[in-house]
Amino acid sequence: SALNLEKNGIMAYVEIPRIDVYEPVYHGTSEEVLAKGVGHLEGTSLPIGGESTHTVLSGHTGLPEAEIFTKLESVKEGDIFLIHVLNETLAYKVDQIKVVEPSETDDLKIVPGYDYATLVTCTPYGINSHRLLVRGIRTEYTQDVSDEAAGQAEEGPDGAGKQCTKKPL
């Protein structure tokens, strides 16, 4: 199958600096896939970018053994997330965050001329009646964007900075 370069089903990796996520992306969204990482929604563009593409990546919330997309609700508009694929890093800047019914798929469609990636998880936590959609628009991956993503990682999910865990000398 396409993009199965590592022969283990991994087609890419998704990185979300704000919430300290770095997860493998697998083909499909079966329970088996979602138990171990992020799934690429069949029928959407492969996560390789390009004009008039829209890849959709889905991950679980609240798994006891893995956080995956548990903290996705902490991502903010303007945040950067990255897709690492084929020795390339694709950067996306979050431009839309919304909660929809599971049957509402209009926001996952290709928009001619645009390169979008949407991260999807169930919400609210423990009820899972709706879907949280975090969409990013492709932006050039420059040193500035890399620095911006690193800054978001430092701020952490609540924007207050990561707690210092070093013990005093």
What is the meaning of each model-derived region?
Residues 1-169:
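Solvent-exposed, non-transmembrane regions of membrane-associated and secreted proteins
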